[in-house]
């Protein structure tokens, strides 16, 4: 069957996945500090989204951040989720932007500021691509932290998640707090 023979609703899922792939390319080609590329990008769908949601719900009991419940429910409205993360690598500038005077004085586990900035620029490029193609997104720290817990982006010390959807109304805004996992 040709795509022109399909209803828009039938073709929408394929379109969203294609946009997500373009978002991944935009993240990859985004400028990087010192030209060093240590970001990782991945796409999850279907059962992986459910697994991510379940992990977010489980994390609430550990840390008490109730907004994880809302976000865990919210990502189930996504057709896919783009994950963008960075490995930890000192860039050797001794700039102090991370809070330490020198790179050698930086405590292990504290990301180099350039690593964090690179993730932010990659996220901006990915979301701009989605906006240009009229697809809805929202950057989620909560889902990114759960993806990091699942180790889906190997060795990444900071991960953000971007759920992606194309529907009549953006499901990622005007969200109501969710008090319990089953409500």
What label would you give each PLM region?
Residues 4-183:
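Acidic, surface-exposed loops and disordered segments
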């Amino acid at each position: 069957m040709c795509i022109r023979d399909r209803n828009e609703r039938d073709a929408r899922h394929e379109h969203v996945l294609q946009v997500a792939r373009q978002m991944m390319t935009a993240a990859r080609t985004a400028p990087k500090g010192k030209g060093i590329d240590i970001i990782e990008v991945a796409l999850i769908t279907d059962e992986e989204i459910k697994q991510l949601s379940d992990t977010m719900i489980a994390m609430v009991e550990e840390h008490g951040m109730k907004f994880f419940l809302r976000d865990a429910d919210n990502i189930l409205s996504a057709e896919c989720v783009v994950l963008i993360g960075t490995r930890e690598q000192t860039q050797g500038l001794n700039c102090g932007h991370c809070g330490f005077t020198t790179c050698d004085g930086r405590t292990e586990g504290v990301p180099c500021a350039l690593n964090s900035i690179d993730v932010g620029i990659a996220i901006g490029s990915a979301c701009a691509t989605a906006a240009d193609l009229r697809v809805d997104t929202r950057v989620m720290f909560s889902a990114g932290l759960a993806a990091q817990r699942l180790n889906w982006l190997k060795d990444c010390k900071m991960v953000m998640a971007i759920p992606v959807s194309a529907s009549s109304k953006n499901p990622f805004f005007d969200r109501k707090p969710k008090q319990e996992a089953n409500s």
